[in-house]
Amino acid sequence: MTVVPAAGAPGTPPNELGVPCYFGRRGLAQPHLLHGWASAEDSHHWNDGLDAALALSLVTMPAQRLHLRVEGRPYLSPRVPRQDITLFFNGARLGFWRIDRLDGALLEAAIEPEHWFGRADAAYGICVFHIPESRRPRDIGEAADDRQLGFCFQSFTLVAPVPKLRG
C-alpha cells in the first residue's frame, strides 16, 4: 500500500515520505513546532526546555510501519557530558538515546500504524522529545545564553522501510 502524506493535524502542513524537513530560518519545520523550541537559527532549532513537541500528519492512516529519522547534534560540554533523549509519539514511548559525542547524531524510531491518531481518513501524531539534561549555559557558567539547551535539531524525515529481498 502507498501512504499518501499531507495535512491531517489542524494547521500542520504535509509530511512527504522520504523528503527531509529542515529546521531553521531557511527550513520548513516551523509550522510543525508546537512548544519547547528556541527561535530559529540559520539551519537549525534548539530545544528550549525539557520537552520539545513536533506535529506530524498524513492524508491516510498508514497500513505499515514508518520510521522517523531526526538529524542533529547534542549540547555537550565538560559540565554536560551527555544528553539523554526519550521520544514519545501520541503518548507511546518509541525511543531512547544516550548521546555523549559532539559529532552529528541520527535518532531513528519506528512508528507503528496503531500509534497514529485518526481524523476522518487522515492520521496525525505529536512527537515529544524529552531531554532532561537540557541546561542553560548561563546557569553553568559557559555563556550568557538563557535558553535551556539539549539538542540542536537540523532535520526530520518520515520514511517507509525498504522491503527486504528474499533469496
Model feature map: region roles:
Residues 1-63, 76-80, 132-167:
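Glycan-recognition and processing domains
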Residues 68-70, 156:
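Generic structural signal for small/hydrophobic residues in well-ordered secondary structure
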Residues 80-93:
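Short, surface-exposed beta-strand/strand-loop-strand elements in extracellular ectodomains
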Residues 60-62, 91, 101-103:
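Short loop/turn positions at the edges of beta-strands in beta-sheet-rich folds
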Residues 94-121:
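Extracellular carbohydrate recognition and processing domains
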Residues 120-136:
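Cysteine-clustered segments with highest specificity for TGF-beta superfamily mature ligands
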Residues 73-76, 114:
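Short beta-turn/strand-loop junction motif enriched in small, turn-promoting residues
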